[in-house]
Amino acid sequence: MKQSEYFADVMQKNHVIAADEYELYQYSLNALFEMAGNIIFSILIGVLFHKLPMTLLFLMVVIPGRSVLGGCHAKTAGACFVLSLSVLFGCVLLPFYLTGISVWIVSFSFIILEVLLWIIAPVECKNKPFIGNQKKRCQIYSKVIILLLGALFMAFLFMKMSEYLLEIWLILVYFSVTILIELHKKTSF
């Protein structure tokens, strides 16, 4: 039995929720546990690799960014967990090894990707479709996320914090790749 089912059962037996609310609470608790587990596991990775500030930055940017910008999403929670951790490792650990890349190349590609996302985001995924007026809200929020990414990039550029600059750049590359993959899927069929 899943934890979410156990807690929903306890809530129903103690008359905290009605029988017709069981599935909603079970689903909500499952989502809560998955999200909390991902965040806690990510923070532990940040602590173990001595990259906690970069991990927290990653979480603060990627969680709202992926929710708003769209793009391809994994079909299962397990696949999402593995892919998310892979992206976390890439965005947090790779900048240390990429500090030799020209700031001009990174900046130029960052601007191109920002313009690309500004034009095409958000992109709906069949595994996570927009509901109701969510697309309209996501269009507005995606512009805010893109502007915030640009502001963070500029701040790290002027403060000469190359690892953080590269992390923001890698996150933008990640967002762009997931969106382009989803667009390719839509045009291929």
Question: Where are these predicted regions, by residue range?
Answer:
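Hydrophobic transmembrane alpha-helices
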Residues: Y6-M54, P64
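Structural signature of hydrophobic alpha-helical transmembrane segments
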Residues: I45-M60, I105-L113
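C-terminal ends of transmembrane helices
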Residues: V62-H73, A121-F130, E182-K186
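Cytoplasmic-side transmembrane-helix entry/capping segments in multi-pass membrane proteins
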Residues: K75-S86, W104-F110, N133-Q139
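Hydrophobic alpha-helical transmembrane segments in multi-pass integral membrane proteins
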Residues: C91-W104, I146-S162
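Alpha-helical transmembrane segments
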Residues: G100-V115, W169-V173
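Membrane-helix boundary/juxtamembrane motif in polytopic membrane proteins
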Residues: C125-L148
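Small-residue-rich transmembrane alpha-helices that serve as helix-helix interface/gating elements
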Residues: L166-L180
